């Protein structure tokens, strides 16, 4: 019991990947998320709620901070973040490590009336820049690589107008911060509903964990609607069950390989 707070609650990845291996098919991740939500730190929850409200700013600050940190002596940055973590808490201030890259390029909208997909570039790829096999900076990160693949394969895409303010909500979901999660999921699903023309176009994300976050977000909202509405959706209510989420790797394998000349 004494060790469970750390080994059971604090360090669980809450991604549910253990469920397929569980002999009784239990999703321990969902349980841990609920327990974290019930025992959330109020200050941290408030901070993450504000972060959800101002995510466009937070996203840019994170990327620029990493770029700036790379130019300073490591002991200075590492020591500063350690002090800040002790004062504000581990959930509020991330720890800085020497092998972290510089910040990535900002996400930008992309319009195309003939789009075949809606591309959802993950904010993690704008916060963290790309690296090559030796750990050195590479201007081509996962987002840029997928865009290049689309261009080579002739796949038309669009990126939502307010993409800079959006996130898959995994940080809030995994930490159990329900208020921030609701703010972000509401923003993302409404934007994707509009960008996909009401679910006509598939959504493709360039980070696997973020694809999972988008899918969980969609399912949670559908479950909430099912509890509220017995006889179907009310008129004008978006039917988010029509949204289709795909990981970029799987989408490329299924829909782009035969269009590429290697």
What are these regions (language model features)?
Residues 1-5, 17-20, 41-50:
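Short beta-alpha connecting loops at secondary-structure transitions
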Residues 7-10, 16-20, 166, 201-205:
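Cys/His-enriched microdomains
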Residues 1, 11-38, 213:
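Iron-sulfur cluster-binding cysteine motifs and their immediate structural context
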């Amino acid at each position: 019991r004494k060790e469970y707070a750390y080994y059971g609650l604090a360090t669980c990845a809450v991604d549910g990947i253990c469920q397929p291996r569980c002999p009784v098919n239990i999703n321990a991740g969902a349980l841990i998320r609920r327990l974290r939500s019930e025992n959330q730190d109020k200050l941290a929850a408030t901070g993450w709620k504000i972060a959800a409200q101002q995510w466009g700013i937070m996203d840019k600050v994170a990327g620029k901070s990493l770029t700036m940190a790379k130019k300073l002596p490591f002991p200075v940055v590492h020591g500063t973040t350690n002090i800040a973590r002790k004062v504000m808490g581990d959930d509020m201030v991330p720890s800085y490590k020497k092998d972290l890259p510089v910040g990535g390029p900002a996400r930008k909208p992309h319009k195309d009336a003939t789009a075949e997909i809606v591309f959802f570039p993950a904010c993690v790829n704008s916060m963290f820049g790309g690296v090559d096999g030796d750990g050195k900076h590479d201007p081509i990160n996962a987002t840029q690589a997928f865009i290049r693949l689309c261009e080579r394969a002739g796949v038309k895409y669009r990126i939502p107008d307010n993409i800079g303010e959006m996130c898959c909500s995994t940080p809030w979901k995994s930490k159990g911060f329900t208020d921030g999660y609701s703010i972000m999921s509401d923003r993302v699903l409404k934007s994707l509903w509009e960008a996909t023309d009401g679910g006509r176009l598939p959504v493709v994300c360039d980070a696997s964990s973020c694809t999972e976050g988008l899918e969980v977000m969609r399912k949670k909202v559908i479950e909430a609607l099912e509890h509220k509405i017995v006889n179907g959706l009310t008129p004008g209510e978006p039917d988010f069950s029509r949204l289709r989420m795909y990981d970029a790797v799987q989408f490329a394998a299924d829909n782009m390989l035969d269009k590429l000349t290697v």
